[in-house]
């Protein structure tokens, strides 16, 4: 149970324990604990509180304040008739603490470096998401021949309404007046589409949105108003037009970038679908983040915008399809550059494997979104069922993710 959502440190001497039981099955629960080196001779006892319930389970929770963080522990469960000990041996009517070194639960040692860090400003963050093309046109004299979408038209990926970064800068006071203090922008880099998730140059702002200097101006002006800017990192895939993929298309295995992508064969053959892509989009080849050179290239992009543009963090597109190893290196580089830069993953499902402190600070909370839609919009839930669903979502993650760093909890986003 150590290093799980049922046993985790929240500081260098505080350990949170949770126990899940069948709903309404248990009268009370306590935990018997001590340093794992002396628990055989003496134990401390601390009651656990039933803090959450969902449709199937009750969740008992307690926080241990420790002087020795090398902890062994056993649960003591009272169901109203019988009493049991719960250890790695399962439920037993008796427990021999003197022989418990083999089977008590443990948190071996709280290494301070392993305690998930907090991004303090996220606790008071209210986000305003902007799909840049659809927001506001602020560059009065730019070429507009590409604009082929009127307000209210049904869009496609290649219809353009003309929004740009200048338009956002002009509306910062309006956004702040709504109570928002963080702006999350969908991708702004060079791309054929309106959504810009098919990036062909990560170092160039798309000309439809303005210039690199316009991004500088937006971030600087926002910071002057105590607002923050978070950009969208598309590191799962790119555009077929990016230089590296074009080189592979031309040279096949002779390209130095061949292993930057995942290609099944000696050369790219779009007709045979022989390379990995995002979704069903042939024009978005998937990066091979397991390749050291490709990973270094992408991580350097993230660091560049933190240093050169002073952005406040990254939202990670399709983050659950990218390797854990890549995200660990990504986090090291980002946090070395700026400890308070936020890292938010686009994970639609249970994301605990990314939220253990070595990868993301939080996620875009689509499970919360779905629960709210089912209750408020579609009338699928009773209030009790809605509460059950929210409690189940909370119990997926640690307290730092739920309360201290806070995920991006939204009712709608550009994908929903």
Descriptions of predicted regions:
Residues 17-21:
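Aromatic/hydrophobic beta-strand junction motif of beta-rich domains
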Residues 409-416:
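Conserved small/polar residues in nucleotide/adenosyl-binding loops
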Residues 26-36:
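Beta-strand-rich binding/interaction modules
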Residues 1-16, 38-127, 137-155, 159:
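The feature marks proteins involved in alpha-glucan
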Residues 126-128, 183, 229-231, 314, ...:
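Hydrophobic faces of well-ordered beta-strands that scaffold small-molecule active sites
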Residues 125-127, 131-181, 188-309, 330-336, ...:
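Substrate-binding/active-site clefts of carbohydrate-active enzymes
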Residues 219, 223, 245-249, 303, ...:
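Active-site-proximal helices and loops of the catalytic beta/alpha 8
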